[in-house]
């Protein structure tokens, strides 16, 4: 006790502003449930596992720790699983994780000799008792994030329900036998609550679904509410009511009265159709979900180094799938595991290692690759009875990598591709002082755009990227005859795709990956291009190639289209991806003998005309959807007036931007030199960088887009003025080699859009494919190579 009293000055009583860690070690994934328990520093309130707490004592000199140990309680092994009613994890009504319960014990430990004192104890100094009580009763910093939730938003009461005017038409709706009033559809039918018309639902992008008669009726009449027939039962809140003006499923508190107007006795009706939310739940068992997750297959669990699962924190599968593949690359393994120990990263970290990206990447790398946390758990999988592993929660890493990012710091589902790009950018910026150690460079490559003017002269633009984003040319499908026969058969049977009983009955377009790559490299026209040779506007031809081939080639398949109502939907297509590809033909050759460069100089008036101005037609369409004029103008400008779909995508992803309501300004009195330097590092000329920053209000991301979308501004400044002066990939710091690549990683997506559903990774390890489905890791028997969203290839040489 005297030893404790002599160190009282190193004990703090936590203030409300203190971040208290007590659930997980800040440099490893040890927890109170680990064999050695967890040690909370009673000065900094950081937590450390048994093997690491001495490092903190050596670094800080803090000797007093609260030791927390959790011991599992015994529970009946035959505890029944609850059937889920929500697409959710860790919430009431969601999937039952069958989590065990634990008893918690405490003691005071004084380093360096690990002298232990019991807690609670009246003999402890009052300051220590108060400090420990505060820590024990506090909500841990690790748990202040939202509880893992994978659930639809709660429906709101429609503003149109309380004022709905129903027409006295004398229509009486029978309890069954419904048919669309304008076609022969007998399923997916909606009853308009104003006039009693029964009409079919929306048509899907591929021709399946309804014939749009219900939504067309709304456009003709402005009658706002409809209820889906077949979802009406005694539980009226479960009925699927849709508001067309609000473009969402809603609650109608007067639904019983509105149904009675058409003679419907809801108490006697039976459920025959799935609601929108239930259809989303049903995706868990449809073909795509089962195929990608390999459900129904006897997957053999695999354990050991490199086979550690990641716990789903709630809509974090996009992060898990991406990081599993990233930490299967030699560059990330070397940087954050092989050549950097946990102790080395901790010693370099600031006072709070939980906020240090290098520390948390090293922690994650060691957690995934050491094998320490990849062992069979004592508890078997509740659904299969197979051995399972608990996995590690990437909570601290997510907090650091998502800091100050409105979307990734939320608990909403995100696009795995967007996260990969965000990760690469953060790692690159963190490696500014040591670029030779930057693992993100292994994904980088140069892109060269050749612009051919009708005069015969050429210009060249160069930039760097880390993904190839590929359009999918459906007209290149190799199974057109099968597709035609399938659609004829389906039309003859009167079946919708949702009615298909077997996945084998569904025929989808099959497009070779080679066709997608060829489409990327093909020529495309540039309208309204100012030719400095012709001194006027003309149409130029642009072709794109790669100036270098990266160590790891990332291919993104553009699988999403916009449906009516600007709802993003997935393109229902298979991509035939070979195990080995050769992109040698895509290498750009640069300025060739006999080619003449376009002359320098673009008139000032042309530059002024390149200032971004919103397309009035795009703005008008967006405004008609209920968005503000200013927001719509910004969306059009920031997508270079590419179209309503592109502007809508930008608008939906930037609604929470802090400057979204700031006035549009094309003038910047002072250009920040650091922003110029950043653009220079991308390979842009200085005067182009300054023009771009001026045109985009100093925003680096917008300035980059401006350069790419304004070739008039960049050709004369970014061209290859001399074939001898052009930098080689080695001079620019980019990796390079041959064009042959081997497929080693696939991120697959299940769901109707990138912002919902589920992501899974398949990785080729030690000659076999392995599935990483959050914390489930097993040998893959049927990797979905044709269903990938993002493909990762490794250069063979």
From Swiss-Prot:
* UniProt cross-references to InterPro entries, sorted A to Z: Papain-like_cys_pep_sf (IPR038765), Peptidase_C19_UCH (IPR001394), Ub_carboxyl-term_hydrolase (IPR050185), UBA (IPR015940), UBA-like_sf (IPR009060), Ubiquitinyl_hydrolase (IPR016652), UBP13_Znf-UBP_var (IPR041432), USP_CS (IPR018200)
Looking at the record, the residues that make up the USP domain are: 308-796
Q: Which reaction does it catalyse?
A: Thiol-dependent hydrolysis of ester, thioester, amide, peptide and isopeptide bonds formed by the C-terminal Gly of ubiquitin (a 76-residue protein attached to proteins as an intracellular targeting signal)
Cite the active-site annotation. 317, 758
Family membership noted in the UniProt record: Belongs to the peptidase C19 family.
Question: Keywords on this record?
Answer: Hydrolase, Metal-binding, Protease, Repeat, Thiol protease, Ubl conjugation pathway, Zinc, Zinc-finger
Q: Where are the zinc fingers (UBP-type)?
A: 156-266
Positions annotated to bind Zn(2+): 180, 183, 200, 213
The family database entries (PROSITE patterns) matched by this protein are listed as: UBA, USP_1, USP_2, USP_3, ZF_UBP
Name the enzyme group at the top EC level.
hydrolase
Q: Where is the signal peptide?
A: none
Question: Which tissues is it found in, per the record?
Answer: Constitutively and ubiquitously expressed (at protein level).
Annotated EC: 3.4.19.12
Query: Under the cellular component aspect of Gene Ontology, which terms does the record hold?
Result: cytosol; nucleus
Question: What Gene Ontology molecular function terms does this protein carry?
Answer: cysteine-type deubiquitinase activity; linear polyubiquitin binding; Met1-linked polyubiquitin deubiquitinase activity; zinc ion binding
Protein name stated in the entry: Ubiquitin carboxyl-terminal hydrolase 14
Organism per entry: Arabidopsis thaliana
Q: What does this protein do?
A: Recognizes and hydrolyzes the peptide bond at the C-terminal Gly of ubiquitin. Involved in the processing of poly-ubiquitin precursors as well as that of ubiquitinated proteins. Involved in seed and embryo development.
Give every UBA domain span. 613-654, 670-710
């Amino acid at each position: 006790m005297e030893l404790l009293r002599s160190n009282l000055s190193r004990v703090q009583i936590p203030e409300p502003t203190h971040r208290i860690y007590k659930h997980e070690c800040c440099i490893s994934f040890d927890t109170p449930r680990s064999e050695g328990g967890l040690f909370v520093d009673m000065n900094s309130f950081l937590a450390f596992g048994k093997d690491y707490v001495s490092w903190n004592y050596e670094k800080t000199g803090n000797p007093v720790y609260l030791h927390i140990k959790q011991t599992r309680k015994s529970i009946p092994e035959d505890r029944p699983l609850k059937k889920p009613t929500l697409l959710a994890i860790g919430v009431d009504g969601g999937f039952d994780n069958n989590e065990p319960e634990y008893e918690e014990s405490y003691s005071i430990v004084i380093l360096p000799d690990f002298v232990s004192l019991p807690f609670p104890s009246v003999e402890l100094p009052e300051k220590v008792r108060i400090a420990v009580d505060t820590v024990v009763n506090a909500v841990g910093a690790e748990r202040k994030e939202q509880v893992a939730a994978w659930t639809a938003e709660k429906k709101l009461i429609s503003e149109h329900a309380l004022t709905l005017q129903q027409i006295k038409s004398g229509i009486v709706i029978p309890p069954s036998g419904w048919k669309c009033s304008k076609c022969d559809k007998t399923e997916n039918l909606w009853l308009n609550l104003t006039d009693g018309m029964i009409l079919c639902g929306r048509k899907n992008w591929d021709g399946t679904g309804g014939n749009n008669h219900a939504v067309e009726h709304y456009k003709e009449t402005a009658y706002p509410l409809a209820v889906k027939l077949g979802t009406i039962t005694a539980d009226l809140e479960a009925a699927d009511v849709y508001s067309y003006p609000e473009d969402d499923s809603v609650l109608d508190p007067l639904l019983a009265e509105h149904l009675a107007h058409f003679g419907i006795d809801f108490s006697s009706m039976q459920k025959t159709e799935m609601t929108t939310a239930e259809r989303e739940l049903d995706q868990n068992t449809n073909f795509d979900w089962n195929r990608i997750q390999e459900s129904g297959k006897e997957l053999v669990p695999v354990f050991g180094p490199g086979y550690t699962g990641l716990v789903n924190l709630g809509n974090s599968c996009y992060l898990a799938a991406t990081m599993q593949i990233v930490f299967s690359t030699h560059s990330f393994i070397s940087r954050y595991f092989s050549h950097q120990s946990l102790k080395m990263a901790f010693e370099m970290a600031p006072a709070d290692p939980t906020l240090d990206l290098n520390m948390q990447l090293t922690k994650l790398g060691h957690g995934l690759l050491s094998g320490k946390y990849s062992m069979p758990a004592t508890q078997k999988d509740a659904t299969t009875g197979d051995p399972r592993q608990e996995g590690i929660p990437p909570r601290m890493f997510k907090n650091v990598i998502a800091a100050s990012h409105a979307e990734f710091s939320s608990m909403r589902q995100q696009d795995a591709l967007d996260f990969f790009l965000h990760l690469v950018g953060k790692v690159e910026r963190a490696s500014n002082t040591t670029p030779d150690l930057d693992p993100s460079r292994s994904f980088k490559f140069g892109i060269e755009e050749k612009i051919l003017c009708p005069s015969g002269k050429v210009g060249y633009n160069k930039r760097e990227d880390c993904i190839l984003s590929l359009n999918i040319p459906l007209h290149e499908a190799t199974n057109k005859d099968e597709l035609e026969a399938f659609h004829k058969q389906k039309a003859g049977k009167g079946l919708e795709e949702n009615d298909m009983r077997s996945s084998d009955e569904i025929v989808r377009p099959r497009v070779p990956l080679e066709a997608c790559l060829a489409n990327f490299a093909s020529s495309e026209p540039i309208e309204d291009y100012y030719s400095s040779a012709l001194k006027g506007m003309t149409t130029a031809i642009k072709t794109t190639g790669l100036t270098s081939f990266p160590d790891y080639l990332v291919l993104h398949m553009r699988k999403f289209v916009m449906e009516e109502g600007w709802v993003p939907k997935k393109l229902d297509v298979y991509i035939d991806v070979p195990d080995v590809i050769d992109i040698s033909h895509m290498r750009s050759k640069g300025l060739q003998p006999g080619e003449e460069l376009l002359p320098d100089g673009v008139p000032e008036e042309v530059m002024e005309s390149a200032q971004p101005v919103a397309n009035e037609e795009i703005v008008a369409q967006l405004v008609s959807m209920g968005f503000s004029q200013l927001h719509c103008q910004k969306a059009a400008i920031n997508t270079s007036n590419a179209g309503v779909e592109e502007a809508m995508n930008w608008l939906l992803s930037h609604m929470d931007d802090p400057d979204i309501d700031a006035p549009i300004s094309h003038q910047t009195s002072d250009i920040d030199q650091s922003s110029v330097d950043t653009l220079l590092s991308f390979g842009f000329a200085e005067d182009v960088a300054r023009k771009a920053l001026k045109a985009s209000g100093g925003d680096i991301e917008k300035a980059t887009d401006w350069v790419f979308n304004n070739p008039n501004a960049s050709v004369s400044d970014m061209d290859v003025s001399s074939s001898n002066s052009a930098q080689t990939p080695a001079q620019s710091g980019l990796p390079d080699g041959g064009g042959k690549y081997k497929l080693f990683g696939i991120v697959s997506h299940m769901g109707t859009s990138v912002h919902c559903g589920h992501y899974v990774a398949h990785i080729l390890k030690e000659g076999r494919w392995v599935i990483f489905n959050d914390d489930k890791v097993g040998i893959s028997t049927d990797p979905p190579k044709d269903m990938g969203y993002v493909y990762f290839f490794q250069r063979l040489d």
